[in-house]
Curated annotation (Swiss-Prot):
It is found in: Cytoplasm; Nucleus. InterPro entries: ARD, ARD_euk, RmlC-like_jellyroll, RmlC_Cupin_sf. Pathway: Amino-acid biosynthesis; L-methionine biosynthesis via salvage pathway; L-methionine from S-methyl-5-thio-alpha-D-ribose 1-phosphate: step 5/6. This is Acireductone dioxygenase. Pfam families: ARD. Catalyzes 2 different reactions between oxygen and the acireductone 1,2-dihydroxy-3-keto-5-methylthiopentene (DHK-MTPene) depending upon the metal bound in the active site. Fe-containing acireductone dioxygenase (Fe-ARD) produces formate and 2-keto-4-methylthiobutyrate (KMTB), the alpha-ketoacid precursor of methionine in the methionine recycle pathway. Ni-containing acireductone dioxygenase (Ni-ARD) produces methylthiopropionate, carbon monoxide and formate, and does not lie on the methionine recycle pathway. Belongs to the acireductone dioxygenase (ARD) family. The gene is adi1.
Length: 178
């Protein structure tokens, strides 16, 4: 995992690297959790299911080869700024991608993830996702309850009024990072 301030250079799938690093501690202050595992990832996921009380999981592959003509629209959809009312938990099984999360001062922090990385985004944090120029990621999604993926756009003014958003903002009020 590598995190840094995002600097828009046109193609969302490129690094867009400002060279301003963001530490794991800074991500923790934003309630973003990260772990890496080098062993068998399905066995690791079994342990996570028990450790965190996850009840469901599935796997998704986002690739130009697999999605064909639907690929560009799918990646565009994932890159729209949004939040969820539940945690977003992803274990990267293969390939790589970028999760962008909003900092306390509303800048984009880009997080590069690759095989073996586990990232947990808290409910209520604005974020987006894109593949890299490799155009391939295989991830496991873990859920506390039934699998669901409901994205609430930042352009929808009601997203700021959601309990998940309010709770998230209260949880980071005392945090000072990036």
């Amino acid at each position: 995992m590598r995190a840094y301030i995002f600097q828009d250079e046109g193609d969302q799938r490129k690094p867009n690297d400002s060279k301003i690093e963001v530490s794991a501690e800074d991500l923790e202050a934003a309630k973003v959790s990260y772990r890496h595992h080098d062993g068998d990832l399905h066995t690791f996921a079994d342990g996570l299911m028990k450790e965190y009380g996850f009840k469901n999981r599935d796997e998704v592959v986002v690739s130009r080869k697999g999605l064909g003509d639907r690929y560009d629209n799918m990646v565009k959809k994932f890159f729209e700024e949004h939040l969820h009312e539940d945690e977003e938990i992803r274990l990267i099984l293969d390939g790589n991608g970028y999760f962008d999360v909003r900092s306390v001062d509303d800048r984009w922090v880009r997080i590069f993830v690759e095989k073996g990385d586990l990232i947990i985004l808290p409910p209520g944090i604005y974020h987006r996702f894109t593949t890299t120029t490799d155009d391939y990621i295989h991830a496991m999604r873990l859920f506390h309850e039934n699998p669901k993926w409901i994205a609430l756009s930042r352009t929808d003014s009601t997203s700021e009024e959601l309990d998940a958003r309010k709770s998230y903002l209260n949880s980071i009020k005392k945090s000072v990072y990036v």
